[in-house]
Amino acid sequence: MNTPRCDQTAAWAALAAHHQGAGRQFDLRTAFGADAGRFDAFSLQAPEVFADLSKNHWDATTRGLLLGLARQCQIESRRDAMLAGEPINHTEGRAVLHTALRAPRGAAPFSDDVHGVLDAMLAYVEQVRDTATSGIKHVVNIGIGGSDLGPQMVVPALDAYAQRGLQLHFVSNVDGHDIAPVLRDLNPRETLVIVASKTFTTQETMANAQVARTWFLAGYGEGGEAAIAKHFAASTTNVAAAAKFGITTTFGFWDWVGGRYSLWSAIGLPIALAVGAENFRALLAGAHAMDRHFATAPLESNLPIQLGLLDVWYRNFLGYTSRSIAPYHQGLRRLPAYLQQLEMESNGKCVDLDGASLPYGTCPVVWGEAGTNGQHAYFQMLHQGTDVIPVEFIAVKTPNHGPDVADELKAGLADQHVKLLANCLAQSQALMLGKTTDDALTDKAPTASTALDALTVARHRTFPGNRPSSTLVLDRLSPASLGALIALYEHRVYTSGALWGINSFDQWGVELGKALCNQLLPRFASGESAGLDASTAGLLARLRG
């Protein structure tokens, strides 16, 4: 598809001119004071997700110019090409069809194949979850990257829907300090091990799988080799390699499923084991609802596209190089780590689709922590630091602590949830309003003694304010709403990547380190350092000693 790069459009030039004028001087407090309808004008409702974008550094003019940029970059036709299965991952010659994994039967390419694997996987899930028959009480998922981050994020998020008596464990790091404590107290006869690797060759995953196999055989005793077939399963396309390992239960997926978009596929096996077939299908349905919103909503009300446009405005015109994710729900504590891979592995690119170096920035650094923990860690910098860092708050209206919460705890837990939500709103409000030096002077002075005069102390207690934030609201954290939220971020990433003119679906930056690691491994045994740079040679010698 022949589309202009964003910086070559008239809309880009118009945005640059706008930034040099009113856009650079934008003040949230002034904007809200001048427009009583700003909240309504800059709020959007998508499936399962409400978004308040009113506390961001944009006005109607800015948004209109950004929508013009989207149209001049042909974002709608590029979106349609992805959804139709065109090979938009051009460096690998592949389609990008994670949306097909959650589409109803017959509604997307490869539907029969997708639903064949899904039905088989969920039938297996129900067998394992019948713990009285299967005898399985623990599931150990071994994977890394997309084979780990997605399931490890979703399982705790949906804890209220999880089956009690079946405990999930995740192992990813090649460091033995990851797997050793997981296996330490498990009984092989009560454990299912999932090996999640598309090729069944991923270094870290296969190293951990071999350790798990050794542990299993040693602990199981007589008949262990034969029992591997019952106690191991694999999410892989390399059935032959899995069979050689002793695994006969395998669930495959396709080369058009990128790792960081794969939790909807057989990689989601541990999710389905945790929450069951019905809830896994609800997760898929929620994501599909967001897919349809992305595919059909006009640009003016299309939430993924609006967020992608805001990302471009912040990164390329206002110069904000970082974004903090603050989910005010402990179940979403792994979401920032998941989004780090989704966004930074997708859009951390420095060349355009033709391989030309980009003259502008792309992906911001994405980081964060669950609220309120983050307030006591890094929010100081958000409020008074020298960098402006947009914050993305995620709030859940109604708590769900699961069906097994004791009655005597319910009132206290409900009160805690109100406190949680109040903290969320207070932080977004404080970032916007700030505190003037005059206000700080009228506040009661700190009780700690100080030799500083009142004005100096007040300056230390001044907040600049005008710090931007968005707030996403879910009514409940359910399989459907979580599916929609994840899909929202996926489509937002594609939107900003398409506007930047990059391929969001390869990850060549990961490959060089893998190749060099394979070259270095034999040197740890031999000590040979010929041809290495002085730093690597010196570190090799120190680490071998």
Swiss-Prot record:
It catalyses: alpha-D-glucose 6-phosphate = beta-D-fructose 6-phosphate. Pfam families: PGI (PF00342). SUPFAM superfamilies: SIS domain. It is found in: Cytoplasm. Its main location: cytoplasm. Keywords: Cytoplasm, Gluconeogenesis, Glycolysis, Isomerase. Its EC number is 5.3.1.9. GO terms for cellular component: cytosol. Coiled coil: none annotated. One of its GO terms (molecular function) is carbohydrate derivative binding. Belongs to the GPI family. Pathway: Carbohydrate biosynthesis; gluconeogenesis; Carbohydrate degradation; glycolysis; D-glyceraldehyde 3-phosphate and glycerone phosphate from D-glucose: step 2/4. GO terms for biological process: gluconeogenesis; glucose 6-phosphate metabolic process; glycolytic process. It comes from the Bacteria. This is Glucose-6-phosphate isomerase. The keyword Cytoplasm applies. Catalyzes the reversible isomerization of glucose-6-phosphate to fructose-6-phosphate. It comes from Leptothrix cholodnii (strain ATCC 51168 / LMG 8142 / SP-6) (Leptothrix discophora (strain SP-6)). The active site is at E345 (proton donor), H376, K514.
